Amino acid sequence: NSNAGTLLLFDVNNIRYVSATKIGEWERDKMCRFCLLTGDDSPYVWDFGSAAEHHKRHSDWLEPSHCLAGVVGMRGTIPPEFGLMQKYAKQIAQLIKDAGMADMPVGVDYAETAMFHALQEEGLNVVDGQQIMLAAREIKNTDEIQLLTQAAAMVDGVYHMIYEELKPGIRENDIVALSNKMLYEMGSDDVEAINAISGERCNPHPHNFTDRLIRPGDQAFFDILQSYQGYRTCYYRTFNVGRATPSQNDAYVKAREWIDASIAMIKPGVSTDKVAEVWPTAESLGFANEDQAFGLQFGHGLGLALHERPIISRAVSMDHPMEIQTGMVFALETYCPATDGYSAARIEEEVVVTETGCEVISLFPAEDLPIANRY
């Protein structure tokens, strides 16, 4: 639905989506590859040195002459005055002209500032290409849903391991290490992050892990962010260690009620503001405004990126609702602080939107508060 004739992509997720190519995960934040899709032509990929020859030999869905070596700025480590940005901006502009797209906008997802300037100096009308790509990636096909389901199944297994290992004497970082090991052994291509939060660290939510020792009676929650064949998980579970207090259990029950209420709302045609409405306000949880509570009661698309569309939050959805559609895959997450002032419960479910509702694909049991190594 865009009016762009060309897409120039530096985001590794967009490059993968358009060209079906990927090199090592180390590339993610380097801005060392780029891809051009112009008119009806097949994609061009400028790769990191010899990776171009590798893709030429092994990526038979690409035109061999479109597998090129090239680099621009690598996040500024190659200064603009070296001239590489101008060199490739000229090459890109010529390819766009050859494809008959010179008079149409060029969607760029993101690039270094100097690269934007170089493209504009070549007379290109640069527009926001990230919105075009995110719209294209909103609806998942059958293969994508299968990969997302497989990724979630891997995390099911990790949570069973955590349920067995979570006991006094083990540290948050030990759980992170064990989880990384298990995921890579199962075939994960990237463990993006694992949050491990326990005891007094549960409130406020710090979004990290430390070397804190687990103690009897701790409430602890974890988030596992990893990908299988590029497709990602965001999947929280809360446990108690040995036993739970009434305050901790009450927090869990509320978090479960909130997430169940949001899952019940999911079906094609429902707008995201209606989902966000069933969650508590920031003020009811002790925050001054929704910005301070952002991400605690939250929904976000899953795919090649951790955060895709739709985004569901009281901070944005009430004024800017989006329509839920069949084929979307997203995570719903809730958070409830306990009345003891430091414990908290966090639950997250991944759902696939079907023609009549949704299917939950995060299957480690979470209907009731799991007690690990019960006394």
Language-model features: locations:
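Active-site neighborhoods and metal-handling regions in enzymes and metal-associated proteins
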Residues: 1-375
